[in-house]
């Protein structure tokens, strides 16, 4: 079976999904793209597509809006396409009724070296924990979240300048680079897939609003990591004069002028830059 004989249905929503979508289009017979339905957003209630839908339209791909994943007509649509694989990147948890459809299984690209950082926010948690490296994993999806057999992994170094945006871009491109070999490994060398060691698993739960709030009593390195983990979106924040202020970049500097601990100085008129004095 050549690559172009392999039928793929792609599932994704975000910018992180798009490099793998393009790789699937280039390498395989991409039958359809499943993404969330367009929604009205903002004060003007403008209809916004997911980044995946925007790209799929540009590439003239068949789009299926996955609103109710248990809907019988939706399931029948997928079955009629006779997929060999589902490829899932930054989408939703697929129910077993969908996982049973593809002939050879469903492959997910996860932005950590599983079993480390299972869950919704692996990139953010790697940065919050000040890791010096992370990576991407391809694995076969099973009903439990992020627990399936590992197909392949690639380690990525986290640099001192990385934030969520830059690291996400690196990982999304790395994951796209693994998809061709991962599909072929499932087809021809499935015995080489590796069971995850559940005793080594760590979790990366969804980020809450409380996680975004800076505690100025924390050590400087913790605050710097927090800013990186949430930049450029959704943004770590603090409150000054009862107003919420998002912080997208920070650095540690010496308090050469002996400003009082807790003081804020060197503030420009738009609060786009300022200094905060901390004890450590």
Which residues does each PLM region occupy?
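Acyl-group handling in specialized metabolite and lipid biosynthesis
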Residues: 205-218
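Donor/substrate-binding cores of folate-linked one-carbon enzymes
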Residues: 5, 26, 85-203, 210
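N-terminal Rossmann-like dinucleotide-binding module
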Residues: 1-44
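Short beta->alpha connector loops
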Residues: 13-16, 67-70, 90-93, 230, ...
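An anion-binding loop in the catalytic cleft
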Residues: 217-280
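N-terminal glycine-/serine-/threonine-rich beta1-alpha1-beta2 phosphate-ribose binding loop
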Residues: 36, 40-84
